[in-house]
C-alpha cells in the first residue's frame, strides 16, 4: 500500500492539499477502524482508535471550508464513533477508580465491576454495529475516498473585492 502524503505543499491551495492528503489519511483511519471492529479489541486499543478518530475529525474540520456542508454528515458519523469509544473508555477508567478506592472483596465493588463489564460489552457491541452500518458497508471507503479526493472549488463572492488603495464604488 502506498504511504499517505502527510506533508503540506505551501505553494498549493488548501483545497489542493486536502485533495492530495486526505484520501491517504482516510485509508489509514479506515484500516485501523476495520481491524479493531472485526476483532476482540481491548478498551485500551479502542481508546487509541478514539484518539485517532478525534485527530481525523479535527483534520477534516480544518478543511470544511474546502468541502462545504456536504462534509457535515461524515463529521457527524465520526463524532458518534468518538462518543461511543469515549463511553467504553469511561467504563475502563471507572474500573481503575474502583481498584484504587474500594476494597478488593467489597460487595459494592463486585456489583459495580459486574455492571461495568456488562456495560463495556454492550458499548463495544454498539460501536461495532455502528461501524459496520456506517463505515464498513460495501463501497463506503470508496465513497469517502471519492468525496475527499474530488477537486475542491474555490468559492468566490458575487461582488469583486476592492484592492489595496482603491475606494469602493458608490452605486
Language model: regions and residue ranges:
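Function-determining surface determinants
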Residues: 1-171
Amino acid at each position: 500500500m502506498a504511504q499517505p502524503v502527510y506533508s503540506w505543499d505551501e505553494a498549493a491551495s488548501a483545497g489542493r492539499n486536502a485533495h492530495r492528503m486526505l484520501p491517504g489519511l482516510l485509508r489509514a483511519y479506515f484500516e485501523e477502524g476495520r481491524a479493531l471492529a472485526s476483532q476482540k479489541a481491548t478498551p485500551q486499543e479502542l481508546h487509541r482508535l478514539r484518539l485517532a478518530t478525534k485527530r481525523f475529525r479535527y483534520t477534516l474540520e480544518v478543511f470544511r471550508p474546502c468541502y462545504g456542508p456536504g462534509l457535515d454528515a461524515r463529521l457527524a458519523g465520526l463524532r458518534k464513533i468518538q462518543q461511543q469509544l469515549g463511553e467504553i473508555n469511561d467504563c475502563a477508567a471507572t474500573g481503575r477508580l474502583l481498584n484504587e478506592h474500594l476494597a478488593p472483596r467489597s460487595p459494592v465493588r463486585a456489583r459495580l465491576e459486574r455492571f461495568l463489564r456488562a456495560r463495556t460489552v454492550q458499548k463495544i457491541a454498539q460501536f461495532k454495529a455502528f461501524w459496520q452500518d456506517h463505515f464498513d458497508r460495501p463501497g463506503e471507503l470508496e465513497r469517502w475516498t471519492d468525496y475527499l479526493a474530488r477537486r475542491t472549488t474555490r468559492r468566490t463572492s458575487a461582488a469583486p473585492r476592492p484592492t489595496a488603495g482603491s475606494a469602493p464604488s458608490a452605486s
